[in-house]
Amino acid sequence: MLHTVNKSPFEHKALETCLKFARQGSAVLLIEDGVYAAARDTAVSPQVQEALKSVSIYALKPDVEARGMQDRVMDGVRLVDYEGFVDLVAQHKAVQSWV
């Protein structure tokens, strides 16, 4: 399953809830303000690092760049462009949006 998170983890619980329900082998795509979860050395970094052990985490590159975060993305989080976003949707049978 592909999970999408578009809310900042510093203002909403969407990421926390998503990671509780994401099963091993799932993919999580951070979009819009959700990309703040991809930043290294933050309060949520340990939670994201732990999740990377069982799920793939992606961040939408245009959203990362729009927030000036391209040099702060933690290791293990993969950046994708819009084409990569479409590919992720096509690869998964279901998409769950956490809002």
Where are these regions (language model features)?
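Structural motif
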Residues: 5-8, 62, 99
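C-terminal structural segments of small proteins and small subunits
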Residues: 67-99
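Short internal beta-strands
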Residues: 27-32, 55-63
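Short, conserved loop/helix-junction motifs that constitute active-site signature segments
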Residues: 20-24, 47-53
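Charged helix-capping and loop-helix junction motifs
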Residues: 41-47, 79
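N-terminal phosphate-binding or glycine-rich loops at protein starts, especially the Walker A/P-loop
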Residues: 10-33
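Short, glycine-rich nucleotide/cofactor-binding loops
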Residues: 1-14, 34-40
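Short, well-ordered alpha-helix to beta-strand connector turns
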Residues: 25, 54-55, 92-93
